[in-house]
Amino acid sequence: MQTSVRRISRAMSLVAMLLVPMLASVALAAAGDTPKSVPDLSGVWEVAFGSRTRPGPGIPEQPALTAEYAQKLAAFKAAQAKGEDVESPQANCVPPGMPAIMNQPYPMELLFTPGKVTIVIEAYSQTRRIFMDGRKHPDDPDLTYNGHSIGHWEGDTLVVDSVGFTPDTALGPSQGYRHSDQMHIVERFRLTAPQTMEVVTTIDDAKALTKPFSATKVLARHRDWDITEYICEQNNRNLSDDKGKAGIILTH
């Protein structure tokens, strides 16, 4: 009897030893562990010198606004023309949010860890977290400046899907182009050369846009760069020039 018990105990121990690495592998897979076959997009990147954001094929140069949001833009331009102190959140150290935060003239760093891609953006000390573990967007996401992002690989392309944006930010190219809390952004990151990356951004918003808007930009990788500290002056205020028009003064 004791011999049988020992045999059963040894068999159970062996099964447990075999299951541990199997369960670990399953856990890594569930966490979205990056396959070895995908390209290396890690490192510090900046918008390439001489590169400009350009619209995608067949897409208009400017976002096509609905009537409601076209009125918002017209009101903004009218106030601007009068020299009024129009809203300028960045003058008060409020981050621009998506998609503008990805178009700043400051570098950003892409960090890859199991189940997650983290983008550290020097401008306004912003961080984006892209979940690669297979999760879905929340049914009712909190509205934030950079939204809720999930991602996956399509061949050699990192595809990032983001929702849940506060309507307090702008689409660009100016603060007059507003969006709603229904804005949906899809980004496609792809290497076109060892140190060059193309990012295609497509924006859809049923309330603010009559059709999706797409733009492409090129980034250059700098292997010897580091992200540095970015401090926006506390309690900053909009300033007016000698003609009474709103503006900001940059100092260093």
Region roles according to the model:
Residues 11-26:
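Bacterial N-terminal signal peptides
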Residues 1-11:
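N-terminal secretory signal peptides that target proteins for export/translocation
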Residues 2, 27-252:
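PEST-like low-complexity, intrinsically disordered acidic/proline/serine-rich tracts
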